[in-house]
Each structure stands twice: as C-alpha cells, then as structure tokens.
Amino acid sequence: MYVLWSVISPRRLILLIGIAFVVAGGAGAFLIRHNASLRTLYELDTRLWFLQLKLQGEVPDVTWTEALRRVGPEWPHRERFDVARAIGSGAAPCPVLWQTPLGKFWGTEKDGRELDLLTLEQAVGDIYEQGPVAVRDSDVVLDVGAHLGTFTRIALQRGARLVIAVEPNPVNAACFERTFEEEIANGRVRLVQAAAWHSPGSLQFELGNASQTGHVAGAQSGSAMTVRAVALDDMIDELKLDRVDFIKMDIEGAERHALAGARRLLATRKPRLAICIYHAPDDPVAVPQTVREANGTYKTFTREGFQAYFY
C-alpha cells in the first residue's frame, strides 16, 4: 500500500476513482435507457452521478465528506441531490437565479427542491425519452406543462428546431420567459401561457403549497386562479405549425383532457409522445385509450407505471 501511495499521488488517485465512477455511472445510464434496470440500479446510477457532479465542480457547496455520505444506503434517496444552487437575485416574480446541472433557471425561493427532483428525473432517469421515443435533431417539440423549462432546455440540447412551451401558471411563465429570453428572441422557443385542455375556454387552476406546480381545480376550490384553456389542435392552427414531432406532457392529471384536444394532431401528424400516467388511478388505462381513439396505429410501452410512450 505504501508503494502504491508513493507511485500514485492523492490527486491522481482521486482522478482514477472519479473516472471509475463516471464509467460505472455511464454504464448504469445505458442500462436504464434500454429498460434493462430495476429501481435498485436506477438508484445506484443516481448515487454515482452525484459523485460525478462533485468531481466536475457542479456542487461546490457540498464537501467531499458530505458527498460520500450521500451515496450511502442510509441517505434518503429523494433527499440525496441538493444540486440546485441559488447564485443570483432578480426582480419579482422570479427573484432567484438557480444553477443546476441542466443550466440556469429563474424561479422563486420554493423552486430549489423541485429543480433537484426534475434534474434527477430528466438528466439521470431520462423519464421523457426512452428507446424510439426521443427528441431528434430538427424536431418541433411541444413541452406541455413546461414549468420552469427543464425539458425545454433538454430538447434544445438535443437539437430541436423549435420548442413550444405550454404553461398556465403566470409566475412560472414569467420565469420561463426570463430564462429563455435569448431563445425566444431568435425564434427557437415560443411560450403559450395557457392550460392544455379538450376545448378552449377558461379553467380554475390551483397551486401546490410547497412549489409552483399546480393542477386544474374542482368547482368547490376557493383558492384557485382562472387561467386560459387551449385545445392543442387549435393552438397548432393559430401558430401555423406545419409539423409536430414530439410531445412531452406532464400536467398533473389533465393529460387525457389535453390529448382529447389534440385528436386531429395525433391522427394526422402522429408525433412521438411521452405522457405521465400516474396522477389519477385510472390514468394507465384512460390515457392510452384516448391516444388509440385518435390514432389506432400507435405502438406503446410504459415504464414502471409512471410514464407511457407512444410512437
């Protein structure tokens, strides 16, 4: 051991360990993307990924001792990734600039934990891209339920020609506009501040207590705001889009309604779909049924009961 230590400096040893973690993390990610992993392998990959972030300097506020603790089995999985860091301040309603491994996002004080989770799900788990259902170069993408724009950022990195972001929350929409100001100016991103629904009109929209995510509220809710509702078929016509290649949809249980408002789009353009199916108990049945009613030629597969993919 003494001979080994004298030959390999501590810095080189750390580098070798880091390379081993990166290789192992890459192998885990490869298996995940090819549906060859169980939940345990997914968790192992996320642990290794955190050390990779530390080696790359992405989490400078976390010490090496703390980073090593977080990869241990005793550390709660959902609390392992404290990767969103507040690095700047700005005007309301988006007073915090967050730095994440996916880039910088304007948001509120509440958004740190949500950005942690979204980074974990999307940068490591690829929850919206599996097998043939992925964003391709020059795609036109609909990001339905855009939130602060994490998937919009991923789609742009994949080479999407245009991303249409649909987001009803006025605070999220304002933060999104600030984050993607340059991309909006050069025409690669367009924001539609509305809720996707089966028909145009207005809806009652209620925010969560701990974050800026929200959902369509029931008639009895007294704390909801009124937001504009759009049918995606109508929106496509209004924007004069000649194609849509990929739709990501995560809208807190309103997915079946939004898909019903996109029947013509699904029937004539057949975009690849990544749809959340865990918000309502019957989503795993109702969402695929809505897609098949619009276009019976879709092939589909699911992932752990959370996501459905159509192509």
Language-model features, listed with the residues they occupy:
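Phosphate/nucleotide-binding beta-alpha loop and adjacent structural elements of enzyme active sites
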Residues: M1-Y311
